[in-house]
């Protein structure tokens, strides 16, 4: 099983290199870089420059806020810089964020994402063939690439894979049919939801003519500590995050499948009334315990096996907040790899 490190999206840029070296030394295979308050390609560059074996994947970069050519060039440069340790993870975000936070168009997201991935692949092919490989459809027209703008060759370095972050069945199907891997969202990483809603879609896409199944990395929220006081604080932090996430209609399917269909509306009502100070208290412990992987170090490998063994190909975990526990966490990583 691929063990993927998460990262605090608000981490100071000058702390990224040390953090990347830390997770590499603990035995993590990959570092996922989100796009929230920093450019994910800048953070990826810092992490890759500081390490020698750690793989880095944007998890995820927002596709619709930038041209596919820009994403392709960034991914190409990072692959070259790292000798093939970078992969491009893409996601859509929700309409309101794309249109109102970024001021970019958002329509037909599944079709647009399909076009985007194909356009990025066309760019990669252009860089390899040293000439323009045109790509044109309803969304993008890439028909010009002069020699002066060709990036340098990367030789035998592996071309970046393209992974997709997906929540709904149509985007999941697109990932299975077109991309190199799938990254789940914290709201759809529950093992029951994966088993009943995600994996069957992937298998169906494979049976529809795709040559092989794609790897799936689950990205659950986690609370992993031996300290009761730290556990209490982490639980409250994660409940606040869940209250924010589950107020978004697009993230409701897990709530429905677990029997909490009314919770999303309740959270949205509190937002509309500007009553969010203690909205995390709306998250019941029964739901929290199902969707958040909570464990001590000793039990972590067992919990991962119980929830995700045989179901997914990788899992994201956040390293300890206290670096004194790094050795114990590294032992957890070794144990997970041995039993999965």
Question: Where does each model-flagged region fall?
Answer:
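Hydrophobic faces of well-ordered beta-strands that scaffold small-molecule active sites
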Residues: 3-7, 31-33, 56-59, 86-90, ...
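C-terminal amphipathic alpha-helical "assembly" element
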Residues: 1-28, 79, 87, 121, ...
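Catalytic cores of alpha/beta
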Residues: 68-76, 225-235
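Internal, glycine-rich beta/alpha segment that forms the wall or movable "lid"
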Residues: 75, 80-86, 90-181, 185-214, ...
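N-terminal beta1-alpha1-beta2 module of alpha/beta enzyme domains
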Residues: 1-58, 64, 159-160
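Active-site mouth loops of central-metabolism enzymes
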Residues: 2-14, 61-68, 156-167, 222-225, ...
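Alpha-helix-loop-beta-strand connector modules within alpha/beta enzyme cores
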Residues: 43-61, 65, 116, 203-205, ...
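Glycine-enriched alpha-helix->loop->beta-strand junction motifs that scaffold or abut catalytic
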Residues: 27-29, 50-54, 82, 174-183, ...
């Amino acid at each position: 099983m691929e063990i993927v490190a998460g990262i605090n999206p608000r981490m100071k840029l000058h702390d990224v290199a040390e953090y990347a070296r830390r997770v590499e030394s603990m035995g993590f295979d990959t570092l996922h870089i989100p796009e929230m308050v920093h450019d994910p390609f800048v953070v990826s560059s810092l992490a890759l420059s500081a390490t020698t074996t750690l793989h880095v994947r944007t998890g995820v970069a927002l596709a619709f806020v930038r041209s596919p050519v820009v994403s392709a060039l960034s991914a190409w440069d990072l692959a070259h810089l790292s000798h093939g340790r970078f992969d491009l993870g893409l996601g859509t975000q929700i309409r309101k964020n794309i249109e109102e936070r970024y001021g970019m168009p958002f329509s037909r997201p599944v079709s647009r994402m399909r076009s985007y991935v194909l356009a990025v692949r066309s760019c990669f092919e252009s860089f390899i063939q040293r000439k323009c490989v045109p790509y044109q459809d309803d969304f993008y027209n890439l028909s010009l690439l002069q020699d002066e703008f060709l990036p340098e060759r990367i030789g035998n370095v592996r071309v970046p894979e393209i992974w997709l972050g997906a929540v709904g069945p149509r985007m999941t199907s697109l990932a299975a049919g077109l991309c190199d891997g799938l990254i789940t969202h914290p709201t759809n990483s529950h093992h029951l939801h994966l088993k009943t809603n995600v994996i069957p879609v992937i298998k169906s896409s494979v049976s529809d003519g795709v040559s092989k199944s794609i790897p799936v990395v689950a990205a659950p929220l986690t609370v992993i500590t031996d300290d009761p006081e730290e556990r209490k604080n982490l639980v409250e932090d994660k409940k606040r995050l869940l209250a924010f996430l589950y107020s978004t209609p697009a993230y409701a399917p897990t709530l429905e499948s677990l029997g909490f269909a009314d919770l999303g509306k309740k959270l949205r009502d509190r937002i509309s009334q500007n009553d969010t100070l203690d909205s995390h208290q709306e998250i019941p412990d029964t739901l929290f315990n199902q969707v958040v992987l909570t464990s001590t170090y000793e039990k972590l490998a067992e919990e991962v096996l119980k929830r995700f063994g045989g179901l997914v190909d990788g899992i994201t975990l956040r390293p300890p907040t206290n670096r004194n526990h790094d050795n114990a966490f590294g032992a957890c990583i070794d144990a997970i790899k041995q039993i999965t």
